[in-house]
């Protein structure tokens, strides 16, 4: 099985790479990042592509003839990091969608998208609305299987700040994990999201998924992660 991973230097994406590297079922891994990742040359089955201008990523996927069985994306940003609502949508929706479309056109059969708890195209909130619109439009691309993961507060060490809101959510998530309060934020370790993402990827290629579209919310994501640990 071959995989293509977008957002591989992020909190969840880097964990997806780690799990993929350790999986004997995965024979090749391709990543596309803005900068040289820490894991470059960490595995003989890993190929890293670099382009600082992410608006060119979809064309790189096409021109490099990157054809993988599974397309996984944990790519994303925040309004604070993007600088404006317009830039946020251009990055979080635009780059994600164009890259997924290119992967589909290149023959990827399964798509695993790491989205967010509360994603809804009808939401009045920019972040949730954009995530929901992205989900809807990626589903319309028509992969054999589209798996959408909606984690709650992500736990783990980030290399880059994603803004005060994310920092607060992560701190509270750490405090509430294992308590009755965890039902509010549904905290989950990024490494566990990585495990679930790769598990779904393998099941999709192996013909073990019955549904064409699978959306996994925070509670179910935690349960699935626990079953894999």
Curated annotation (Swiss-Prot):
Keywords: Membrane, Mitochondrion, Mitochondrion outer membrane, Transit peptide
GO process annotations (BP): import into nucleus
Primary location recorded for the protein, binned into one broad class: mitochondrion
Signal peptide: none
Transmembrane segments: none
Pfam families tied to this protein: HIM1
Transit pept. (range): 1-36
A GO cellular-component term linked to this record: mitochondrial outer membrane
InterPro entries: Him1/Fmp52, NAD(P)-bd_dom_sf
Localization in the cell: Mitochondrion outer membrane
Topology relative to the membrane: Peripheral membrane protein
Family note: Belongs to the FMP52 family.
Stated name of the protein: Protein FMP52, mitochondrial
Source organism (scientific name): Candida albicans (strain SC5314 / ATCC MYA-2876)
């Amino acid at each position: 099985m071959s995989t293509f991973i977008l957002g591989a230097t992020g909190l969840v994406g880097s964990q997806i790479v780690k799990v993929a590297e350790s999986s004997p079922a995965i024979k090749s891994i391709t990543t596309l990042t803005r900068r040289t990742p820490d894991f470059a040359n960490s595995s003989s089955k890993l190929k890293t592509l670099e382009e600082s201008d992410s608006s060119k990523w979809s064309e790189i996927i096409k021109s490099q003839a990157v054809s993988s069985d599974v397309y996984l994306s944990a790519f994303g940003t925040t309004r604070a990091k993007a600088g404006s609502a317009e830039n946020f949508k251009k990055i979080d929706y635009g780059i994600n969608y164009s890259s997924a479309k290119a992967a589909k056109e290149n023959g990827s059969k399964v798509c695993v998208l790491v989205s967010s708890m509360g994603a809804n195209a009808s939401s009045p909130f920019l972040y949730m609305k954009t995530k929901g619109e992205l989900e809807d439009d990626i589903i319309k691309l028509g992969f054999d299987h589209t798996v959408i993961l909606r984690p709650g507060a992500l736990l783990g060490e980030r290399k880059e700040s994603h803004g005060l809101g994310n920092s607060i959510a992560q701190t509270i998530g750490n405090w509430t994990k294992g308590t009755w309060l965890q039902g509010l934020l549904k905290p989950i370790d990024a490494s566990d999201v990585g495990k679930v993402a790769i598990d779904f990827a393998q099941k999709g290629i192996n013909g073990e998924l019955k549904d064409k579209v699978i959306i996994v919310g925070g509670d179910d994501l935690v349960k699935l992660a626990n079953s894999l640990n």
